[in-house]
Each structure stands twice: as structure tokens, then as C-alpha cells.
Amino acid sequence: MRARLPLNALRAFEASARYLNFTKAGLELHVSQAAVSQQVRTLEQMLGVALFTRVPRGLQLTDEGMHLLPSITEALQMMSSAMDKFHEGKIKEVLTIAVVGTFAIGWLLPRITAFLNENPWIDIRILTHNNVVNLAAEGIDASIRFGTGGWINTENILLFQAPHTVLCSPETSKKLYIPSDLKKVCLLRSYRKEEWNNWFKAAGIDPWTITGPIFDSTRLMIDAVKLGDYAALVPYHMFQKELNERSVAKPFEIYATLGGYWLTLQKSRVNHNSEALNVFKEWIIEHSREFVLKS
């Protein structure tokens, strides 16, 4: 029969080894210094070795103590992790969501705390991407992407359209009276080549060759426009905070709908989703509808 493990003594040893001080270990464990010392002494007697030597300013691990410590630390961490998997009688589920960065900061993160408060049993992991993601290969439960929804082997659910317009710094906006004034500034580009031409068409003006730098991050483009005579074509709803703070400006009420934000799921899992994924799916669809109504 396996000997009964002296868990209190092992916890006392591990805390004492971290602090090299019985008093500090006792404060962490909410017991007295004498109680910690006694627990360590009990463990030493069971093992037949000394785990610490007493030095003027505290404790020092013996060779035997240093040999024992990593195994005890790992075991206690594993027990703690096992307990963390439960919340109020329910096993916690890990949910991994890959989110395009613009949506993550502009929409999801301001709302995710409310979702977690409603569903504390869900342990959510948020990964950001630049619209390229492989759900199956990367072990991702769901993704939020920008585009027109034509991705293969996925179920694609439109959350909302994302009309694009020009944003720039407040100073730059002072020189932009009509759309053709954009020739005076450097236009920043994304990897989607036709975006500016689509906006020029919506503005009723002829396109011109754009040579501004190409960015793989819309967020980075907005950081750039704050620095000089730049303009970026972006989904302005995702930058409402910056517009409200007047760190960026919207010189024209001209919009081009270039795509939307989509929730994408593996087709092979559509009918076999975890409870956590189903709850998240219902939540984000509901809140997206509310967002559209308010917009």
C-alpha cells in the first residue's frame, strides 16, 4: 500500500525552500513559524535526511533538499492545475479563438470581460493573426476573419459588414477638403490591392497610382497616420475610440464596403462543437447584432 503523503509537510518544505525563511513561509501558508518548522522537521524524519541547514540570515538547502525540491514543486503545481480545471462543480473548458488584430482590439477585447463574467468556466485563449489561419492544423476552435466569407472547409457566419473610409491625423485632415486632395499626402496600403480603387469609385473620382508602404496590420497603419502626412483606408468602426479621443480624424463621409467580419468554424466540427464554443458562438452573434443596431 502506498504510504500516505504528508501534504502539509510537503507544502511547508516547498514554501520554505522558495523563501529560505520559515517565518515568510508561514505567512504564505497562514500558519506560525513554529508550525512550519515542525512540518519540515516531520518530513526530514520521514526521509531520514536534513533538507535545510540553518544559517545566520535564514535557511540554506542541503544537497538532498535541492534534489527533492523540483519534484515537489512540479507535483504541487500539477495538483493546483487540476483543481483550477473546476469552477463551481463544472469542469473548465479551454476555448482557443484566433482573431484578426483589428477586430480583437477594436471590438472583442472591450466586451470579452462581460463574456467571461457570465461564463467563468470557460478558459479562453485569444490568438491574433493577419487573416491567414488554419483552424485544424493550429488547434484553433474558431476564428474571426475579415473578408467576403469564401474560405473553404469552414462554416462562415457573417457578424457584420465593415465599411472602410479614410482616417488621418487631425492636422492632416485640415488640408483635405475634397477627395482628390488625398494626392497631397502619402496613402498607406494593405495587402488587399483594390481597396483604394474601390474607395475612389465610391468617391466618384478617377484613381491614381499609390506608392505608399504596404502594411500587414491595420492597427499599425493607424499608429503611422498619427505621425505625419499619411492617410489610411480602414474599417472606421474599429477605431471609434481613437475618433472619440480625436487622436485621428475622418475627413470624408464616403464609405466603401470591402468585406465584413466573419466567425469561421471547421465544417467537420459544426455538429460536434464543445459546449464552450457553442456558448461563445451564440454570444458573439447576439452582440454583433446589437452592435449593428446601435451603429
Swiss-Prot record:
Domain HTH lysR-type span(s) in chain numbering: 5-62
Q: Which residues bind DNA?
A: 22-41
**Any idea which UniProt keywords this protein has?**
Activator, DNA-binding, Transcription, Transcription regulation
Q: Which GO terms describe its molecular function?
A: DNA-binding transcription factor activity; sequence-specific DNA binding
Tell me the domain of life.
Bacteria
Give a single Pfam family match.
LysR_substrate
One biological-process term from Gene Ontology? DNA-templated transcription
Family statement drawn from the similarity comment of this UniProt entry: Belongs to the LysR transcriptional regulatory family.
Role of this protein: This protein is a positive regulator of gene expression of carbapenem-hydrolyzing beta-lactamase (NmcA).
PANTHER family assigned: HTH-TYPE TRANSCRIPTIONAL ACTIVATOR AMPR, HTH-TYPE TRANSCRIPTIONAL REGULATOR
- The name of this protein is Carbapenem-hydrolyzing beta-lactamase transcriptional activator
